[in-house]
Amino acid sequence: MAGGVAAAGLALGATILLWWAIDETHFPRTDAAFDQLTDTLSAIPGVTLDGSERWVESPTFSDARAWIGATVDESALDAVREAACLSPYPDDVDWALRVSTDGGNAVTLSIGEEGTGPCPLVGLDAAPLFDRLDDVVTGLALYANVQADGRLSLLAEEDPADGVGGLLPLVAHAEDLRDAAGMDSTTAVEVGAPSLGVVVAAGEQERLSAMLSALVDEHGVTRYFADGGPQIDGVDKVQVVAPAEEHRAVEARVRDSGLPVADLPVRFLPSD
């Protein structure tokens, strides 16, 4: 009987450990220095603290993680960076900073690099990027980040009112935005939105912009995706939404573009 109880106890313990291993529940861990940091940020003019958290996860319940989200006027970004970097809080912080630019855009910077402590190191020159972005578009909400492969990623949260056409200035000025961000001239730029997904390689912005403009203005294309992302069938392709009577002309435009996508199969998606 005792052996059975022991076995049952071991089984229960193993089940609990397994549950802990897959459970992602956050267990709060308060810290005075972290609270001081969030209080300091909240007091900066032009900063609205959207949320903050410091927690541990099962099964180790160690190595606390921290996150801070804030909406920041562009003019207050340097003050946020200074307050964070001078904070006595010693550990890494994951940041989500939504910056309201002077030109009416909203750019979210997701920042979190191991070993940087609380300092929000963006990986790009934010202020010049915002200035150039404001010259190109207005009223867009974007995520701007440096991806693991080094590319600059500019992803719109929603399509603008005029659809994919309103995103084409980002493609036409992709290399200008990259340069403003202080990145190497060989760096590719990913431009994405619900209706668009492209990667602008170095030297391609003019040809890609011209092709996309023709597809939208002359052939009624409302969605275009060729960003090199994972495909369900493992086959790279160009995916397009366009009127049926324009399919042949759309494919011809892609074939004649001289871009790397010219050799990819073109697949037409159903209209919304």
Enumerate the predicted regions with their spans.
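N-terminal Sec/ER secretory leader and immediately downstream segment
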Residues: 37-99
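C-terminal region of N-terminal signal peptides and the immediate post-cleavage residues
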Residues: 12-40
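N-terminal export and membrane-targeting signals
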Residues: 1-11
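Extracytoplasmic/luminal low-complexity segments enriched in Pro/Gly and acidic/polar residues
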Residues: 180-272
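Short edge beta-strands and adjacent turn/loop segments
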Residues: 44-67, 141-154, 222-239
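Short secondary-structure junctions
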Residues: 42-50, 89-92, 133-139, 216-223
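Non-cytosolic head/periplasmic domains of membrane-anchored proteins
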Residues: 94-169
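Short amphipathic alpha-helices in soluble, non-transmembrane regions
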Residues: 40, 78-88, 167-178, 211-215, ...
